[in-house]
């Protein structure tokens, strides 16, 4: 078969599926991405994992950006250091948002809390979503109104949920202008051609997918000449019919 660990992933988790039971197709509604799990996020379980003997953590990095690696490893490194010092790392809502913005199809503990398939697999989308802002309250000629769950500034990337059943397309673009409205709501406007507002509807879910300020900060951290460098000696042994063996010293 095609191994994702060898760069040959068939992307089965990104595809919609149908269920046929006793010859009849089951109405799944929006829940069509049956193999698309939420991302395993165990940052708040680090002390427990170390306590039970976990000695190494693997963080998904395949097809991810350098900014993602800098962001996620930074948060996990802090959690590990705090755990070794006998303290539990505190993750603020902003910390979690930063991790979600780097890449997230929703966070879950996977099977670390036992079996809960409905939490592990939502099934209603298969792409990166980021931070859920809320639902569209109203649609105007040049933008939408909603009460966002977190701060939105000009330049932020957004995506609006689509609906395959009704033909409502998924759309995304960058915010051009943010206008304050009443009762904590804001009006978001977009650049010309970025989002077709006529195709947006009240009740549509809105997600924040990118924060330019966060991305710029992460890129600066990658260019920091004072960043700690560690010498690493790798020795690899490959033989036909045997597993690849790599030692790091």
Language model: regions and residue ranges:
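Surface-exposed amphipathic alpha-helical tracts and adjacent flexible/coil segments at the periphery
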Residues: 1-249
């Amino acid at each position: 078969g095609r191994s994702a660990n060898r760069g040959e992933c068939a992307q089965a988790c990104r595809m919609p599926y149908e269920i046929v039971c006793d010859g009849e197709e089951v109405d799944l509604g929006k829940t069509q991405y049956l193999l698309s799990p939420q991302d395993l996020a165990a940052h708040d379980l680090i002390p427990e994992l170390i306590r039970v003997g976990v000695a190494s953590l693997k963080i998904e990095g395949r097809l991810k950006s350098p900014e993602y690696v800098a962001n996620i490893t930074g948060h996990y490194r802090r959690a590990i250091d705090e755990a070794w010092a006998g303290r539990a790392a505190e993750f603020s809502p902003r910390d979690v948002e930063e991790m979600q913005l780097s890449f997230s199809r929703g966070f879950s503990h996977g099977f670390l809390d036992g079996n809960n398939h409905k939490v592990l697999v939502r099934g209603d989308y298969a792409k990166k979503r980021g931070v859920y802002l809320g639902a569209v309250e109203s649609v105007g000629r040049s933008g939408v109104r909603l009460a966002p769950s977190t701060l939105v500034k000009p330049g932020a990337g957004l995506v609006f949920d689509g609906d395959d059943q009704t033909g409502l397309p998924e759309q995304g673009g960058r915010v051009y202008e943010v206008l304050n409205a009443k009762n904590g709501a804001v009006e978001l406007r977009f650049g010309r051609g970025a989002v077709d507002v006529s195709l947006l509807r009240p009740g549509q879910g809105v997600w924040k997918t990118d924060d330019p300020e966060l991305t710029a900060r992460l890129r600066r951290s990658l260019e920091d000449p004072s960043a700690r460098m560690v010498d690493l000696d790798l020795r690899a042994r490959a033989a036909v019919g045997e597993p690849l063996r790599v030692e790091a010293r």
